[in-house]
């Protein structure tokens, strides 16, 4: 079967408007296309909705690290595991603003603030809202990931100037119970709905390499693509090994071609969403990242650290994008830098 012979019935084809009724068989058909056909379809749709030679650059800061009561089996910040990550208090406003300013000057267009909470307390949310407003004044897009939200909390974040709320589903509904027991998948879906109803854009994706099967990876994409509205940002994370967490017993970094196929299927199923090549890039070769961009990834995190794990150095990212002829805010930062 080649790309031209793919048929999904009901009048659907790969040139249709975004859909919300993807089936398992359709997802499997896409994933199993010959590699060249899959990449061709993904790149064709990518060009229809995005500049194929531009990548979004975001920066992620942990404003409150560790001590999280959730038992996510991959996470170094869970209080359930002896990962070596020390719990910290919520950062001061001025420290967050200064970090955001440096991120902007280094080439970030979006600044994401993460706190290791099950859900924010109102007194802490007051402080986060103040941070959001201040970061927004720097000319950056704002994103936050703070755990579960009530409808009122989502509205408060929106009113403070927050653009995006991140709350990942992590994996398929079927595999979910193998990695998390303290928060249900429905809890996550409810928080996404609260964010959407408050007027926030949604950032939602997952992790591959936790010990799941290909069917689980596709199930995660189906869950996202069949939401009432597609997430505006879809981060695809690759498992990062951290000390003393349960998934280390079964997790394995995915085959590189499998990662590219996931990116391509995400691009096809959610053609207007930004697909972020997220955690795990420090393990990827330049060639693998180039294939992911070709398959439809168009966002990365810049900065040497992602929460508690490493990330490629910004200079390496800038050099790679330059070699590929891909533009980003890193170009503006380079042009503005004083000569040596």
Swiss-Prot record:
Residue span of region Disordered: 1-21
One Pfam family named in its UniProt record: Radical_SAM
Catalytic reactions of this protein: (4R,5S)-dethiobiotin + (sulfur carrier)-SH + 2 reduced [2Fe-2S]-[ferredoxin] + 2 S-adenosyl-L-methionine = (sulfur carrier)-H + biotin + 2 5'-deoxyadenosine + 2 L-methionine + 2 oxidized [2Fe-2S]-[ferredoxin]
Radical SAM core domain segment(s): 53-272
Keyword Mitochondrion assigned: no
Enzyme Commission number: 2.8.1.6
UniProt-listed InterPro entries: Aldolase_TIM, BATS_dom, Biotin_synth/BioAB, Biotin_synthase, Elp3/MiaA/NifB-like_rSAM, rSAM
Enzyme class: transferase
Residues reported in the UniProt entry to bind [2Fe-2S] cluster: 112, 143, 203, 276
GO MF annotations, alphabetized: 2 iron, 2 sulfur cluster binding; 4 iron, 4 sulfur cluster binding; biotin synthase activity; iron ion binding
Pathway: Cofactor biosynthesis; biotin biosynthesis; biotin from 7,8-diaminononanoate: step 2/2
Function recorded in the entry: Catalyzes the conversion of dethiobiotin (DTB) to biotin by the insertion of a sulfur atom into dethiobiotin via a radical-based mechanism.
The protein's name: Biotin synthase
Organism whose genome encodes this protein: Nitrobacter hamburgensis (strain DSM 10229 / NCIMB 13809 / X14)
Name of the gene encoding the protein in the UniProt record: bioB
